[in-house]
Amino acid sequence: MLETLTVVVPAFNERDSLERHLPRWLAWCASHEALLIVVDDGSSDGVEELLAAHLTDRRLRVFRHRGNRGYGDAIKTGIYRTETPYVATMDADGQHAIEDIELLKEAMLREGADLVVGARPANQPGGGYRRLGKAVIRRLASLLFSMKIRDLNSGMKIYRTELVKQLLPFCPGSMAFSDVVTLAHLNLRCVVGEVPIQVVPREAGKSTINTMTAVDTVLEIINVMMWFRPLKIFLPLSGLLMVLGTAWAVPFLAAGRGLSSIALLLILTGLMCAMLGLIAEQMAAGRRIDLPEVATTELKSSG
């Protein structure tokens, strides 16, 4: 039987969770023509030994990083080694239900999507700072990318393998991977869908997400914006500086005191930002990739 889907699970010190859920994941893969790739990101709690004990199952492939390289790099390792037309990702902490991947795949086939995101409930468990961080990231992405994805950093997604492999070089190896890979699809005008999924509380292990994760994600979003659409950052900044400079200059000019040095500095800095933005846009245009053939379909007569 030819498999069409591979599920990639990055794991770092998630032995207890994998021990609980791995048999169920493998059973699901067996009944849905799917393969499972688990990437051990340098775990030190016995994940390697646990996974080795399950390698008799032909549907399981295991890759191990010698050191902890990061969530995004673990996902990249799995996707680069995927050979099926579709690849899904989910977290190793057991909060995702592997059964929801079928919903994402159905939506992808139905809508002809290039990426489908599993949207978690808005009232999911989490601290106030964590929810605030997600809201800030979502708002920033909305302003810079004109996007309307509700759960930008969900770990459960399904991709067209050929397309996502071409976007991986633009994505970071950190926790920001989930946000950036979605934004990369949106920036290239790919068809991105979203399907509600359920999450359950973590039963074992401890989350590694913290405040610095949100800071890193914001910086990576700005970095992606600079790579793809730098004018969206430089032009607003330029306009703001020039407006401030003009507003500062008007009272001095009206009083006959000439042009203020501060006003001149603000206006010149604004002009420099505009010029830098144009140069950056030209550089971005030179390295911008074209949509691959997988994102293009040909309409044929039904007769």
Where would I find each of the regions flagged by the language model?
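Hydrophobic helical membrane-anchoring modules
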Residues: M1-L2, A176-G303
